[in-house]
Amino acid sequence: MNEPFATSHGTILIREANPADAVQFRDLRLYALQDSPTAFSADYQRNLSHPPQYWEEMLTMHADASSIFLARHENDLIGMTGIARGNTPKTRHSATIWGVYVRPEWRGLHISEELIHACFHWAKARKVVAARLGVTATNASAIRCYERCGFRITGTEPRAVYYEGQFHDFYLMYCPLDNL
């Protein structure tokens, strides 16, 4: 983590977010919710109404509970994802990866995979042994990305998202972290 990697578009740095990233994180999150509305259960209008302190608090380190990782090229925020560990003694061994997004012009460069691997590193440092996520069932490129990272489809959540008069199913995916 925090090791830059080269792409055909330039060098990318993946790192944990902090409150100083709040404005750029908000902008990217809102952009993502408009660009790919069926990929997220979050809603653009609701997120738009959040005050600045909401975004700062979201990026405050929560130590063992959760984190957000950002992909940067120079001063531009180009990708993001979050991870949240189970919050009870019976679920602390697992974590949910959420909000994976890379700007369209940066896709195809394995940035999402690097973001996910940063989540894996964070999780393993906290003795988390399994990760899970949900992905829109029609998002073939995201599914392939997650499979390259070690995830496998374990089920379907029918009608997980409702957007503009249509329901969208999510595939539920699981990745054991023991052998990574």
Residue spans for each PLM region:
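Acetyl-CoA-dependent GNAT
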Residues: E16-A20, R26-D27, Y31-E105, I116-A118, ...
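C-terminal "cap" of GNAT-fold acetyltransferases
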Residues: V129, T136-I143, R148-C149, R159-L180
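Conserved GNAT acetyl-CoA-binding A-motif
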Residues: I116, A123-G134
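Conserved hydrophobic beta-strand within the GNAT/NAT acetyltransferase core sheet
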Residues: I97-V100, A131-V135
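Active-site acidic-Proline motif in GNAT/NAT acetyltransferases
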Residues: R103-L109, A137-T138
